[in-house]
Structures are given as structure tokens and as C-alpha cells.
């Protein structure tokens, strides 16, 4: 009977376990301390110790609870842990069963922020290759911000001043608090459902880390990254930053700066337009002067080598041959007249009437033959001259132009073969009545080589 008062190890351990279970102070315990001896096996559970300078508490957090915490616990991290105290019977010790954990103090938000930033950066959400180019001349700008804050006033004022023609559509949203992230994501989704928004601005004015936190939450950062509409993120003041700044296509230091990035200043555009107009006029004037010089050179070339000049030369040659022909004809007449005079003298000397008549007849025949020969020679010379003129007319470039042909120049140089041209060359084609400028878009060479 004496031995009935002894309890087994299991029994006393079970008793102690029951004591912890029924103790209301042990059912929900709030513990603050530093993590040490952290381990996470393949099961996904966390095994660690929560300690302070006076004591330590063995702790465990099961996998289901681990999945709900928004950061990665590390040794040396100060945390706030909620859970219950129980007994691990196999080891015969009490331990803390953690059900919720969060970093301790304001530094906890920075830890959570840095850990989420590292995770999203590893996934590629901040990569420059993903970022879209902002449109140069947007017609509609969407703004996701508070409808009562200074940010929306700054954005509207700046856009209206820089480009009054741009339509601004404000999507009012709460920018801090528990529901802020959800509302921001909803508005980004609404904007992407439209097909007329060119660029959107999301952001708010300055504030503390807690007040800006909605723009650090993962759903917002991912919605910005997934947006088909280019996004400008402008959260807080110049020294502030949010994770939405990194996933956005462009980060602006302030809401005013975001508006300046979203739309151009019409005064700058007017100056640029005037400058380009001046440059275009200068280039056009230079091109016109070059064409005028080229035309003048072509005129001089035609004057020296054209059919008119050739005709004048042929006319000079005709006059020269006509003069020679007249001289030869006059000489023949003179010779015949001299012979006639001699015969006439002889006739007077001998008075042979029959001989005189015979000589007169011969003289007449000779004169007729000579006249006929001279006329035929002159006719032959004229026909030859006109044939040469016709040949010159056919060889003249202007004659080719009249028949529908064109003369092609490249940089004021005559083009004689298609092999001298390449696709993309600018050419000038001289035609009857003027010329045209053309661009070579295709080229096909004759396979025969002709």
C-alpha cells in the first residue's frame, strides 16, 4: 500500500499538463523577447527560444501559423509573440506554443519592408527591362489618390498649367489604413479595364512609414507591376520611398514631379516646334539653292551641247559650203565666158557662120549641163544637211524627253546603269516640262547584263 502514493513520470507530467490547460493565464499569453536558436526543419515548423536578459522560453510555431506571418524571423530579432503555455511530455518540459508573431517596435516595419523588397526584387518585379516608356503626348491621365489631400490639388494644378488640353480623371481612394491597399488595387484594376487611359499616377503626400504603408503592401506592388497602363508612383516627399516606386515604370519624388513627368509643357513644345520650323526652312532653302545651281549648270550644258548649238554649227558649215559652191559656179561661168569670148573673137576673125552656130549650141548644152549639175549638187548638199540635222535632233536629250523618256541623275551626276543605284537612294529624273525627285524602293537588274 505504501507504493500507491508514488506516481509514474507520465502521470505527474500529465497532471502538470492539465494544470497548464486549465490555468486561464496560460491559455493566451503575450510574450516580448529576442529570438535565438531558431531552426526550421523540412516540416516547416519553427523551433526557437524567446529570451530576455533574465530568462528564456522554449517555443514552437507550427507550419500553419508560420504561413500567416508577414516576415521571416531571424536570430536576434525582437518580436511580439502570442500563444499558449503547454507541456511537451516526451521531454518533460513546458514550452510556449506560438500562434502569432510580429516584429517588435517601429523597426519591425522596416524589417518587414526590407524582407518583402528582397523577395519581390528576386522575382524580378523591379527589373528595368519590364518598365514601359511613358507616352510623349498623353490625352488622358488617371490619378489614384485621396480626393481631399494636397497631392491631388498639386497634380491637377500642374497638369492644367503645363498642358490644359489633357483630361485628368481622378479615382478617389483612401491612402492609409487597413482597407487602403485593397482600394488602391481596385482602382488600378478599373483603370486597366479602360482602353483610353494613356498614363496613371498613384501616390499621396508625405507621412510616416505607417501612414505610407499601403503603398508597401504586396498586392499594391504587384498590381502596379502587372498594369498595362504605364504607372508613375509618387508617394510622400522626396526623401520618402515605397515599394510601389520600385515596381512602377517611373518613380517621381513628389506628386507635382509626377504631373511634370506625365505631360509635356506646351510652352516647351512651342519653342521646339519653332526651332524645328526654322531648321526645316533653312534645310529647304539650302536644297532649293543646290537645285537652282544644278539647273543653271544643266542650262549651260544644253546651251553648249544642245541641238540649237549643233544646228548653228551646221548652218555655219552650210554657209561655208554654199559660198564655196557659189565661188566654184562663178569660176566655171567665168571660164566658160572666157572660152565663149575667145570663140567669139575667132568667129569674128574667121566669120564661119556654121561654126558659130555649132559653138553656140555646144555652149548652150554646156551651160544647161553645168546649171543642172550645180542645181543637183546644191540639192544633194541640202538633203545631206537636213539628214544631219534630223540625226542631231534624234540624238538630242531633249528629243528623247519629248518622246516620253527621262534622264536620271543621282547627286547631280548622270546615271548610265541600274548598277549605279541602290535601294534607298534619292534620284532626280528630268522629263519633258520639268523634273521629279524619287526614292529607290526596289531594284531589279537585267540578268542578261544589258
From Swiss-Prot:
One of its GO terms (cellular component) is exodeoxyribonuclease VII complex. It is found in: Cytoplasm. It catalyses: Exonucleolytic cleavage in either 5'- to 3'- or 3'- to 5'-direction to yield nucleoside 5'-phosphates. One of its GO terms (biological process) is DNA catabolic process. The keyword Hydrolase applies. It is an enzyme of class 3 (hydrolase). Bidirectionally degrades single-stranded DNA into large acid-insoluble oligonucleotides, which are then degraded further into small acid-soluble oligonucleotides. Heterooligomer composed of large and small subunits. This is Exodeoxyribonuclease 7 large subunit. It comes from Listeria monocytogenes serovar 1/2a (strain ATCC BAA-679 / EGD-e).
